[in-house]
Amino acid sequence: MNKQQLKAYFMLMRLHRPIPILLILWPTLTALVLASHGLPDISYLVIFTIGVVVMRTVGCIINDIADVDFDKHVARTNTRPLTSGQLSIKNAIWLCISLTLVAFICVLFLNLYTILLSFVALFLAILYPFCKRFFAIPQLILGLAFNFGIFMAFSAIQNQIPVEAWIFYIATICWTIAYDTIYALADREFDLETGIKSSAVLFGNKVFRYILLFNFLSLLLLIILGIYCDFNSFFYLGVVICSLFFVRNYFLYKKLGITNCINAFSANHWIGLIIFIIAVIQYI
């Protein structure tokens, strides 16, 4: 394998774009903190961090395999390894299988409940790329998939999925719908031409209102989480800071344009970091 092929595999796994990994990682780590009522054992941090990175790459590979014919016609995606012919579909499938096995080996160190949940996580990762063809809001499926690590974190530590896990899960789903709708704005014109489904297409000229609505719902659910868990004022201060980030992002993505939308999307990882920090503070 030469240097060019290694670079192609690197690009296929999206390791050059770590923001989506962080968007999955922060809620998962936060769930570990909530489930542990403090800093979790280092083994959980290692297993879940590896799992997030590996399954994110698996999702990207499945997405590229599913969308290879569409990506050829989009300027933003027509240089990807599969669409440009740098790697074959067969190469991608073998890599996907190998990485899935790595993720499964990681989860074998956890309890049976979490192992069973891992199959649901894999199903969601496979489903998302294809649901863009028939489901009006594929961002909902993405939210279910991206944040499923929350359930796995609680099941690994508590062997159950308590009420606070559900509240946090739904909050992050609303957050994901909002930020991925921003991302979808970059491709909305192409999606309209090809019939690809997305929330950016469905919401039409009211898309900005819906993004704000889902941001608001995520904040509201975080407040409910704080009340349910009897968190201190630092948690609510963090929620206020998150709301300021949402307002800042609004003025960015409202200008439209690929660069503005991608930048607004990417800035959301700071939201995840803030929530993680304020969760840790609760148990110091």
From Swiss-Prot:
It is found in: Cell inner membrane. Pathway: Cofactor biosynthesis; ubiquinone biosynthesis. Its EC number is 2.5.1.39. It holds the Pfam family UbiA. It is a multi-pass membrane protein. One of its GO terms (cellular component) is plasma membrane. GO terms for biological process: ubiquinone biosynthetic process. It is an enzyme of class 2 (transferase). Its cofactor is Mg(2+). The chain crosses the membrane at residues 19-39, 42-62, 85-105, 107-127, 134-154, 165-185, 211-231, 233-253, 261-281. Keywords: Cell inner membrane, Cell membrane, Magnesium, Membrane, Transferase, Transmembrane, Transmembrane helix, Ubiquinone biosynthesis. InterPro entries: HB_polyprenyltransferase-like, Prenyltransferase, UbiA_prenyltransferase, UbiA_prenylTrfase_CS, UbiA_sf. Catalyzes the prenylation of para-hydroxybenzoate (PHB) with an all-trans polyprenyl group. Mediates the second step in the final reaction sequence of ubiquinone-8 (UQ-8) biosynthesis, which is the condensation of the polyisoprenoid side chain with PHB, generating the first membrane-bound Q intermediate 3-octaprenyl-4-hydroxybenzoate. PANTHER family: 4-HYDROXYBENZOATE POLYPRENYLTRANSFERASE, MITOCHONDRIAL, PRENYLTRANSFERASES. HAMAP family: UbiA (MF_01635). This is 4-hydroxybenzoate octaprenyltransferase. It comes from Francisella tularensis subsp. holarctica (strain OSU18). The lineage of its organism: Bacteria, Pseudomonadati, Pseudomonadota, Gammaproteobacteria, Thiotrichales.
